Amino acid sequence: MKFIVSSTALSSHLQAISRVINSKNALPILDCFLFELEDGTLSVTVSDSETTMVTTVEVNESDTNGRFAVVAKTLLDALKEIPEQPLTFLINPDNYEITVQYQNGKYSLMGQNADEFPQSATLGDNAVRVEMEAEVLLGGINRSVFATADDELRPVMNGIYFDITTEDITMVASDGHKLVRCKTLAAKGNERAAFILPKKPATLLKNLLPKEQGSVTIEFDERNAVFMLDSYRMVCRLIEGRYPNYNSVIPQNNPYKVTVDRLQLLGALRRVSIFSSQASSLIKLRMQENLIVISAQDIDFSTSAEETLVCQYAGNPMSIGFKSTFLIDILNNISADEIVIELADPSRAGVIIPVEQEENEDLLMLLMPMMLND
């Protein structure tokens, strides 16, 4: 079996899919790339038994069809060191010996029998299909994946919930402290449907989608989802279970509204939070007429900080406490210049929305408050 392929094309595709591979695998074959050559098309597959990713690479020349597995790390490290040039792969089908010939030399390594590689999951007849622009899907994942939980007791919270209707698609993530709801009007389904995408495949998509143009086709049933991109195909196990009613936790009547420059607030939080209690990271926001006072103190070390920002606020003076790391996370994942913080009282969640929404998008973030001692 022989084929010739561009070194940089192969290396970049292998690099992209190698993130699927776990550092420790129960099955040794899962440390490998599965190469399959069929009618002049080379496809390479990786799997961690829950997520499988396949990429296709153009070959310049090939002879017979065939398949083999090869340890991913060895091949990746070897290809990284070769500048752009054609590589000739020669595979002995009897003992899986692989020779990679390049301009001034060759590599020899042992492959493995491809039959041991696990089959990827297939979808049932009741699979639902939706299409989204790559840019829209990337935007939703980017804004929400940081809010997913790591909760063994409530696994449904460990992923992004895709709520599909005939009018829009909403992506939701929450860890019980913060919540993100990103609704896009630029995509919709033919019927009401939903699925929960685990954090790992969501992060894999986050890395792949910036390179993609055009639309992504998503097909899913109760157990698995398939994401079809131009050069990649990802099959992943979904999180099974019922996602909580996210709309019911978003406070509807918030009489106090603070409009503030996002980057100014972010800078102030980063400075002031250095002096917050290491145990709680509590910062206090005190709103008064057109001013917001951000303060923190660490009683154990007798340190404190306070900073005042100009904002738009016309209500009664009010104070609320938040965990600074969570609030910084939220502000980092909004791109608008100005934000509105909507509040009802110090014991209810704060709703944070951009003053100017992106086109065809409705983004809302929510943060639970912390108790203030004073």
Predicted segments, located by residue:
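Structural preference for solvent-exposed beta-strand-turn elements
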Residues: 1-374
